[in-house]
């Protein structure tokens, strides 16, 4: 194998490693985003429920007052 072929092979191997690394990093970032989005959704639901409970309590208190 000539030097240019060896250089081409080394270059392709370097690029393959870089692409594999980029794919792994992208996958890890996407997985983290899915988890973060799920936690955010759960938190939003909990806050909504708490807000509704507070509003219900306030309405009940107003009804008792008048």
Swiss-Prot record:
The keyword Nucleus does not apply. GO terms for cellular component: extracellular region; pilus. Keywords: Fimbrium, Secreted, Virulence. Its main location: secreted. The keyword Mitochondrion does not apply. Residues 46-66 are annotated as: Disordered. It is found in: Secreted; Fimbrium. Residues 46-58 have a biased composition (Polar residues). Belongs to the HrpA type 2 family. Major structure protein of the hrp pilus, which is a component of the type III secretion system (T3SS, Hrp secretion system) required for effector protein delivery, parasitism, and pathogenicity. The hrp pilus functions as a conduit for protein delivery into the host cell. This is Hrp pili protein HrpA. The lineage of its organism: Bacteria, Pseudomonadati, Pseudomonadota, Gammaproteobacteria, Enterobacterales.
């Amino acid at each position: 194998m000539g030097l240019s072929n060896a250089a081409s092979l080394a270059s392709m191997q370097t690029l393959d490693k870089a692409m594999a690394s980029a794919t792994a990093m992208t996958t890890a970032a996407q997985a983290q985003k899915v988890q973060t989005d799920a936690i955010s959704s759960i938190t939003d639901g909990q806050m909504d429920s708490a807000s509704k409970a507070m509003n219900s309590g306030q309405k009940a208190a107003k009804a008792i007052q008048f």
